[in-house]
Amino acid sequence: MSIESLDWFVIFIYLFLLILLSAYLSKDQKDLKDYFIASRKQKSQNLAISMLATQCSTNSILGAPAFVAFTVGGGLGWLKYELAVPLSMIVIMIFIYPIFYRLKIISIYEYLEKRFDLKTRLLMSSLFLFVRVFATGVIVYGVSIVIELITGLSFIYSVLILGFITIIYDILGGIKAIIYSDIIQMVILTSVLIFILFYLTNILGGFQSMFDHFPEQRNISLNFVDHGLGDGNEFAFWPMLIGGFFLYLSYYGCDQSQMQKGLCAKNQNEGQKIFFLNGILRFPLVLLYCLIGVGIGAYSQINSDFITSLPKQDGIPNFNLAVPIFLIENLPIGVVGLTLVALFSAAMSSLDSVLNSLSAVTMEDFVKRNKILNYFSKKNNLFFSRLITFFWGVLAIILAFYVEDISNNVLIAINKIGSLINGPIIGVFSLGILTKKVNGNSACIGIICGFLCNLYCWVYLADVSWLWWNVIGFIITFKIAIIHSFFFSKSQTNKSYVWSFRFFKEMGFNNTWINRYIILFIWFIIIFCLIYFL
C-alpha cells in the first residue's frame, strides 16, 4: 500500500511547520523552569487541552474502535471506564494537586524526599522511568504499523520518522512547544475524527442505521453482579469503575507526564481548573472514537470481506488496523494524507509530553544531585536536559521493535503495563499526604510488596481482571506500610507535607472550587445515565 504525492505534501508541510513552531518558541528558553514548566505562566485552558491531547494517543484511536467493534468481551462497555474520571478528578483537586503546586517543584517525586526520604524519591522516580519509557515504546509501535500500512514505508523507517521528528521538536521547544503543538494537534485530530464519524454514518444510511447493523451483544450492558475476580469478566462494571478510579488517580495525579502540565499553571486556582476541564471534556472525546468503533463494527457486518482484508498477526486479523484500512479503502487522495497527519498528531501529543517528563525526572531526581553541575551555567543545564530528552527518545524507538506480542489490543497493553504500578504509586503518595507517622522505610517496603502482588496476579491469576490490580496494589502498599510503621517508625513528619483542611483553605479554597466539585459529581451521574440508557 502507498499514498499519493499530494498526501506526502500534506504530511511534509505539517511536520515542517511543527518543527518551525518549536524553533520559534525555543528562543525564550533560559533555564530548566522554562524548559520543563514554562516558568509557570500558562493559561489553564491551554494546559487542559494539552493534558487531554496527551491522553488521546494514536493507540486510543486504534485500540478503542477495535475494542468496541471486535475485541472479545468488548463493545461499548468501554464507556464504563469513563465513569471514574470525574470522581478521580475531584480527589486530585482536593488532596493531591494543592500540595504539589505549593511546593513549586518540577519533579513530583521531589515531594517524596521532602515527606519521606531520598531512597523513596529515587525508587519511585526509577519506577516511573522504567514503566513509562516501555509504554512509550508501545505508542511508537502502534502508530508506526499504521504509517507502514498507509505509506508503504518499512516498519523501521516508520518508527524512525515518527520518533526522530518528535524528538527534534521536543528538544527544541520544551514544554511550551509541547503545549502549543498539542492544541494544534487536538484541533486536527478532533476534526478528522468527526469527519470519519460523519463519513461512516453517511455510507451506512444514517446514525440509527449504523446502530441497527452494530451487533446487539456489543452494546452496553450494566451487569452489577459480575465482579471480575475470577469469573472471567475482565471488563465488568465494578473493576472498570473502582479499578478505573485508582488508575486515573495515579495517572492524572501521581504521574509526571500529566501533573507536569498542572505545575505550569499561573496559580492554584488556574491549576484546579485544568483538572476540572479534563474531567468534563474527556468523556465526549472518548465517546467520539467509541462511536467510530460502532461504525466500523456495523461496516464489517455489511461488508463481509472487510475483516478478511485486515493484515494477519499469527493467523488472527489485526483489528487495531481496522480504522486505517477502512480509511485507505474509502477516502480520496489528499484526505488520506490529512488522516495520517491526525494519526501523527495523536502519537506526537502523547510522545512529546512523556519524553519531556522523562527528561525532567532524570534531570531533577538524578543528574542535578551531582555537585559538579553547580559549576555549570543555566544554559549548560538546559543543554544536558535536551541531551537527556534525546536519550529517552532513542530508547523508546528501540523498544518499539520489541513490544509486538504484549497484547492484541494496544490500548489494553498500555493500561496493563500501567496497572502493575498504578496502585503502589497512588498508595505511596496517599501515605505521604494522609498519614503523619509512616516513614520512608515503611513506604518502600509497601511499594515493593504492592508491585510483587500485582506481578503475581498477572502471572498466576489470569482470571482476575487487570483493572483490579490498581486497587490491589494500592491496598497492599498502604496496609503493609501502615503495619510496618506501627512497629518500627517513631518519627513524625513536617505538617506542611500532610493534607489538612486548614492547609487546603490556605491554598485559596473558595466557592468556585466547591461548584467545580459539584459539577463533576453531577457529570458522573449524567455519564452513568447515558451509559445506562444507551
What are the language-model segments listed below?
Residues M1-L534:
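Membrane-embedded helix-loop-helix hairpins and adjacent transmembrane boundary segments
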